Amino acid sequence: MSCDYFNRGLCQSCRLMSKPVTEQLLEKEARLTHLLGGLPVDERLAPVSGPEFGFRNKAKMVVMGAAHAPVLGIPGPDGQPVDLSHCPLYPQDMQALLLELTSFVRRAGIPPYRVDKAKGELKFILLTRSAVRGEFMLRFVLRSKDAIPRIERELPKLLADFPAIKVVSVNLQPVHMARLEGEEEIFLTQATRLDEVFNGVPLFIRPKSFFQTNPEVASRLYATAAKWVDELSPKSLWDLFCGVGGFGLHCANESLPVTGIEIEAEAIDCAKTSAAAMGLDNLSFAALDSTDFAMGQQAQEVPEVIIVNPPRRGIGEELCERLSAFGPRAIIYSSCNPETLAKDLALISGYRIARVQLFDMFPHSDHFEVLCLLLKEAACASAD
């Protein structure tokens, strides 16, 4: 794939852009093998990849420049603003909307926030796209409420020109620090969430709920985990760090009770909405810290299978030891950081790595997702 931003040295986010995707995958597999080191792996499955461009469903744009000449993108190598509205990672309709949002900010006369002077109002524009419907959630991250009337004044025209915009909100982030969003969310539309569907499973996206940025590869990740769980035929399952419930909902059926734990309340609301839409009453989702849940009194009945999908920091020593002590038949570990994955796998005792599969969730970058199936030592022979 060719990218003008990369070729001109304006953006280096896609560090591997100059290499064919096949070569990128070989490098990523080699890195994963190196990080896992001496850990024995029974089966290394072929990597899963998706489209090379037009796949990304989320844009995080820094707003720079001036109210009369705003720029949506990133600071360039020389510190000057770089407009990323034509980034080829985004679908064409998303690029068109990003370009229009530049004009919207100019018409509204909202001064971009200047970090060097701690002045201005508009810090970021966050745009999320539903792949199934092509609808958008648009968020303006502001320093204060002062610019909200300007947004409301121009919003009717924007919604008329781009009817695919379903959700619009303002996020207030008043502090002068490198933080993407604040606590308060003010909706400017009646709708407060996007609808998404992966593999026939209804999923929902709210402003603060984490959602995978590559829908095609994410749907295959969830489907693979569900297939592995189905092969195990467990009678109970936990989905820790569950987000909007993607893994647990894909595994759910009328005979499999699922407990999903996630610290972000908005994500849990999405998961509960999905469970209701699926007509399943044996799914339980709670807004709790996953480690605290596993260490607490609620976790006395150990499930047969535990899925963990932690943030980049991994699950950590305490939870690794707890899972080892629990001794479920299987642990499925989905990781976006192979370095912390390797550390955690070395700390989980009594299990063998039955399968490892790389999912190229972030083409052209160094990042990737890994799915691991860990089987209890005594259970390996019967489950293979």
UniProtKB/Swiss-Prot annotation:
Major enzyme class: transferase
Location of the active site: C336
Origin: domain of life: Bacteria
Disulfide cross-links: none
Binding site for [4Fe-4S] cluster: C3, C11, C14, C87
PROSITE patterns in UniProt: SAM_MT_RNA_M5U (PS51687), TRMA_1 (PS01230), TRMA_2 (PS01231)
rRNA processing keyword on record: yes
CDD domains per record: AdoMet_MTases
EC number: 2.1.1.189
Keywords: 4Fe-4S, Iron, Iron-sulfur, Metal-binding, Methyltransferase, rRNA processing, S-adenosyl-L-methionine, Transferase
Sequence positions that bind S-adenosyl-L-methionine: Q212, F241, E262, N309
Pfam families, per database record: tRNA_U5-meth_tr
Molecular function GO terms recorded: 4 iron, 4 sulfur cluster binding; iron ion binding; rRNA (uridine-C5-)-methyltransferase activity
InterPro entries associated with the record: 23SrRNA_MeTrfase_RlmC, MeTrfase_TrmA_AS, MeTrfase_TrmA_CS, SAM-dependent_MTases_sf, U5_MeTrfase_fam
UniProt GO BP: rRNA base methylation
Primary role: Catalyzes the formation of 5-methyl-uridine at position 747 (m5U747) in 23S rRNA.
Family: Belongs to the class I-like SAM-binding methyltransferase superfamily. RNA M5U methyltransferase family. RlmC subfamily.
Name of this chain's protein: 23S rRNA (uracil(747)-C(5))-methyltransferase RlmC
Organism in which the protein naturally occurs: Shewanella amazonensis (strain ATCC BAA-1098 / SB2B)
